[in-house]
Amino acid sequence: MAAAKTILRSLAGETLPTPPIWMMRQAGRYLPEYKATRAQAGDFLSLCYNPELAAEVTLQPIRRYGFDAAILFADILLLPQALGADLWFVTGEGPRLSTITTQADFDKLKPVDEIDAVLNPIYETVRILRRELPQETTLIGFAGAPWTVATYMIAGRGTPDQAPAHALKDENRELFEALLARITQGTIEYLSRQIEAGAEVVKIFDSWAGSLKGADFQRYALEPAREITAAIKARHPDIPVIGFPREAGDGYIGFAKATGVDCVALDNSVSAEWAAANVQVDGCVQGNLASSHMVTGGQALIDETRAIVKAFSGGPHIFNLGHGITPDADPDNVQRMIDAVRGQ
């Protein structure tokens, strides 16, 4: 039964003797089987839009490690592509998009009710996964948070300081907020379709939340997360939402109450002890082992994993990394982490 799934129990506020575990980017280039399937697909976007192959790479880490959750294999930039932005990937450099910096650029975007024409293969991937995943494994869908997605749409690429997005916000706030509103509404529909296809949990990734300060954090990180969560809860009241305002620092405090999310995912810039005292008091937390341990391994990996489990043992906790696993990670270190979490 779904109610017995450990991830869902933690998200409902239950403190378990052993925390459930999954890993951001658990389907990825550190796994040889992923690289083989990626080669079969031809390129990254072709893999995302091929339901059978996307389901296969989602299932690979479940078969290998027995994680408590599978996260849909996709990308946060599929939504901007569905809204009409050009999207391509440059080998060794990452994503590129056509930029949205003028009203004319914005006017070329598609309305939200047209996104399914592009995103239907993603929903089919979800349906395949619900059929093929082990009964005890929770299926997580996801999307990027509006601020983070906007930073890519404005700059046309990832940037170290999100300066182009901050510049548009300051110079043409009306256009900036119109773009954020379009992304917010698109995110609500995109996540709702994932849920209708079978996702049991959804996660909102705000990878660049840490670059928002003060009133901007409230307005462009908290408020969109609250709006999306409220809309999801109105349509799907039983579906938990995880929020990840990466590098929010003190902004993690009160995030769950301000947004309505069921769980706050933590990066590893905050200590587990601090987060237990300041964030876990409001409910479930997820995290927050440094992904570098998946590369270096050794006793430090075991010790830090056990320390995080201990720090969060007084409340609901889902074990995860503080950032996505990197391509240079050792697959054996992932198993060592899992064994340490599960007390083996």
From Swiss-Prot:
Pathway stated in the Swiss-Prot or TrEMBL entry: Porphyrin-containing compound metabolism; protoporphyrin-IX biosynthesis; coproporphyrinogen-III from 5-aminolevulinate: step 4/4
Sequence positions that bind substrate: R25, Q26, A27, G28, R29, D75, Y152, S207, H323
Gene Ontology CC, one term: cytosol
Pfam families noted in UniProt: URO-D
Catalyzed reaction equations: uroporphyrinogen III + 4 H(+) = coproporphyrinogen III + 4 CO2
Domain of life: Bacteria
Cell compartment(s), UniProt: Cytoplasm
EC number: 4.1.1.37
InterPro entries: UROD/MetE-like_sf, Uroporphyrinogen_deCO2ase_HemE, Uroporphyrinogen_deCOase
Gene Ontology molecular-function annotations: uroporphyrinogen decarboxylase activity
Any single biological process term in GO: protoporphyrinogen IX biosynthetic process from glutamate
Matches recorded under PROSITE patterns: UROD_1 (PS00906), UROD_2 (PS00907)
Annotated site residues (Transition state stabilizer) in this chain: D75
Swiss-Prot/TrEMBL keywords: Cytoplasm, Decarboxylase, Lyase, Porphyrin biosynthesis
Family (UniProt): Belongs to the uroporphyrinogen decarboxylase family.
Role noted for this protein: Catalyzes the decarboxylation of four acetate groups of uroporphyrinogen-III to yield coproporphyrinogen-III.
Subunit composition and interactions: Homodimer.
Protein name stated in the entry: Uroporphyrinogen decarboxylase
